[in-house]
A protein has these predicted regions:
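Regulatory and interdomain segments flanking nucleotide-handling catalytic cores
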Residues: 1-351
């Protein structure tokens, strides 16, 4: 459906008398993307002018298709899959993580950074083909997992953040607190990733996050060789990306509407269970360091549980897409926003 030039040079429209007429489209009304190949960030408005980064050159469509085929075939071979065999879940995860990363060996210096920025539609080049595939996969999974084929947006946050950070008494405390919150954020996102896939998380983008890479390698069993060129594999110093607090304390995900509450409650349980396990391990190590028997000392464990009671707080909200429905279901037009307006009224002080 994509066309580098739109509208077309001619367009057929019905006249007042009902007859179809063919009209010429003037040049100023046409979008000729190849003459000004600029990619625009949908949020910041930042522009990436391809003409200033080597420009555009003719590339055979068949050549791109072949390189794409070889790239994804290579990922399947790395998983040990041949002729349709293998773990489909692993294949999805490998495609999601490494699909946008075309190696120089496979690229032959032709596409370079443009591979990651290829627009989904040159008529509106404000998002890449990978963004399009991420959203398509996320919604397809949510639709398929819901008995009514309905998706919902789930927004979830953990906290409180400021009091937790304010309790720090040194720079190392600040680093440890930020790192712990980032890890808690991942533990909150992990149940969603395990149930629906990491593509279901719309914000933050998880692709390339070192903590997520570790999960893909160690828990989802993607081959270590796929991560050989990742920055977090290159050194063990403090500058390793694994030591960075890379995740915020909130996320937005596309989930099956009927499972939104269940998923949110599962997230809350997972986060508090993980933190409690860490607390028990800390107490055990402290007791061992003090020369006490970790198995026969009850008071420190009880104190730790009391200190962590109710932490972290988990707040969430879910909005089903059914709040907006088309009145014309055949053509999917004439949207009815009454239910959405009613749901949003309290937030805008509307009676």
């Amino acid at each position: 459906a994509d066309r580098p030039q739109w509208p077309m040079e001619e367009i057929s429209v019905p006249g007042h008398d009902g007859k179809i007429r063919t009209l010429q489209v003037t040049p100023w009304a046409q979008v000729r993307w190849t003459k000004a190949p600029v990619l625009i960030h949908p949020l910041t408005g930042a522009e990436f002018d391809l003409a200033k980064h080597g420009g555009l050159s003719d590339t055979e469509i068949g050549d791109i298709k072949q390189r794409s085929f070889e790239h994804f075939s290579g990922l399947l071979k790395a998983l040990g899959a041949h002729q349709g065999e293998g773990d489909l879940r692993q294949a999805l995860l490998a495609f999601w993580r490494f699909g946008p990363e075309l190696s120089e060996e496979n690229d032959n210096g032709k596409l370079g950074a443009l591979w990651k920025l290829l627009p989904a539609d040159t008529r509106v080049p404000d998002h890449s083909i990978w963004d399009h595939l991420d959203l398509t996969s996320a919604f397809a999974g949510a639709f398929a997992a819901d008995p009514d084929g309905e998706a919902a947006l789930l927004a979830l946050s953990i906290g409180p953040v400021q009091p937790f950070i304010a309790a720090a008494r040194s720079t190392s405390d600040l680093w440890a607190g930020s790192h712990l919150l980032s890890r808690l954020a991942w533990e909150a996102m992990r149940p969603v990733c395990e149930q629906l896939g990491p593509d279901a998380i719309l914000f933050p983008r998880l692709r390339g996050v070192p903590q997520v890479d570790l999960w893909l390698r160690d828990q989802m069993n993607l081959p270590d060789a796929l991560f050989a060129q990742c920055d977090w594999q290159q050194g063990n110093t403090d500058s390793n990306p694994l030591f960075s607090a890379a995740l915020p304390n909130r996320f937005v995900a596309v989930v099956p509407a009927s499972q939104a509450r269940e998923i949110a409650e599962k997230v809350e349980t997972a986060v508090r269970t993980w933190l409690l396990d860490q607390g028990q391990e800390v107490v055990r190590r402290l007791l061992a360091e003090a020369g006490l028997d970790p198995e026969s000392t009850e008071v420190p464990y009880a104190q730790m549980k009391a200190q962590l009671a109710g932490f972290p707080e988990v707040h969430w909200a879910a909005v089903p897409f059914s709040l907006i429905v088309p009145r014309n279901t055949d053509r999917q037009t004439d949207l009815d926003t009454l239910q959405l307006s009613t749901a949003m009224a309290p937030f805008f002080g509307v009676e």
